[in-house]
């Protein structure tokens, strides 16, 4: 008997702790022999939106490791959908390494009232909330422990006046630690986009991320492989600088039907560095964007 749909994976607050918790629970309820049964449903942990927010679809962007361009992909997805007329927001959950504001050229701190926090908007109307927009000096480090970071991520959901938003992208830090777990437990995530790169080692790391979404019972909408190839400007031939990957094999093995491959294009990171990600006009994420639009 499966316990997946009756467990919210909140072992710390479980009223019926089992031996798995003492040994380090891996949240693999389907293969657990204990079936705690005292944790309640997954929905019990979801945090409510406030009265000033009507977010229709929450999409988490994750990667198994850093340095694959996850925040750049998040920014590009938000920008493209905004240009198509959708109301879009980005919750920057990478609290200690935020880069979303820089991609959009947003430097002004967020405003707040006694009731809520107001997101900043990009030139094209993408709403953004980030830890960097709380600091007096955006180069100051945030040196916090996990529970405090997780608490701020939840506040970005419960205390921000998001307004009417069709798609809220949650840009998560790399890995499968505290913040992804908090996001998957606290927010009504409709699906996940996994960002990766072509190196062999990455396929193993991608599988870790995909397996986490399976354990949390959240579908993977698609995989984005960044830096997949380089197009010669003289002959238009594709060159696989890092070798051809097996991302399609990984996708098939987990029944993921959507893969977008982004070329190495120096123009995109240069625009992000200038805060002009919305000026990038190449259509490199069409497959994933079309999959996301089906949620609307």
Which sequence ranges carry the predicted segments?
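Inter-motif core of Ras-like GTPase G domains
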Residues: 161, 180-201
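C-terminal lobe/tail of nucleotide-utilizing enzymes
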Residues: 2-43, 210-296
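Pre-Walker A adenine-sensing motif
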Residues: 44-52
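Walker A/P-loop phosphate-binding motif and the immediately C-terminal alpha-helix
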Residues: 52, 57-94, 210
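Residue-level signature of catalytic and energy-coupling elements of molecular machines
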Residues: 55, 66, 92, 100, ...
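Glycine-rich phosphate-binding loops of nucleotide-dependent enzymes
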Residues: 129, 172, 185, 291-294
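Phosphate-binding/switch loop-helix module in NTP-utilizing enzymes
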Residues: 135-183
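Phosphate-binding loop that captures ATP/GTP phosphates
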Residues: 87-88, 93-138, 143, 150
């Amino acid at each position: 008997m499966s316990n997946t749909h009756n467990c919210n994976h909140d072992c710390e607050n479980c009223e019926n702790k089992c031996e798995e918790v003492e040994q380090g629970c891996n949240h693999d309820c389907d293969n657990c022999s204990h079936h705690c049964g005292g944790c309640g449903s997954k929905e019990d942990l979801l945090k409510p939106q406030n009265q000033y927010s009507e977010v229709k679809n929450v999409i988490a962007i994750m990667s198994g490791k850093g340095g694959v361009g996850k925040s750049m992909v998040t920014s590009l997805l938000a920008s493209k959908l905004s240009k198509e007329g959708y109301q879009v927001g980005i919750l920057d959950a990478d609290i200690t390494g935020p880069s979303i504001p820089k991609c959009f050229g947003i430097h002004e701190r967020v405003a707040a009232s006694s009731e809520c926090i107001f997101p900043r908007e990009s030139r094209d109307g993408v709403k953004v909330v980030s830890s960097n927009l709380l600091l007096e000096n955006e180069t100051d480090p945030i040196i916090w422990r996990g529970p405090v970071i997780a608490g701020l991520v939840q506040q970005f959901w419960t205390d921000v006046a998001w307004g009417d938003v069709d798609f809220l992208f949650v840009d998560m830090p790399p890995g499968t630690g505290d913040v992804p777990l908090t996001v998957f437990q606290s927010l009504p995530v409709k699906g996940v986009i996994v960002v990766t790169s072509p190196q062999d080692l990455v396929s193993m790391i991608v599988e870790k991320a995909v397996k986490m979404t399976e354990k949390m019972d959240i579908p993977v909408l698609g995989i984005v492989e960044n830096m997949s190839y380089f197009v010669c400007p003289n002959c238009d031939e594709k060159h696989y600088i890092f070798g051809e990957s097996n991302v399609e094999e990984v996708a098939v093995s987990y029944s993921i039907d959507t893969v977008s491959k982004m070329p190495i294009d120096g123009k995109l990171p240069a625009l992000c560095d200038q805060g002009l990600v919305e000026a990038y006009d190449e259509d490199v994420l069409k497959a994933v964007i079309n999959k996301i639009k089906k949620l609307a």
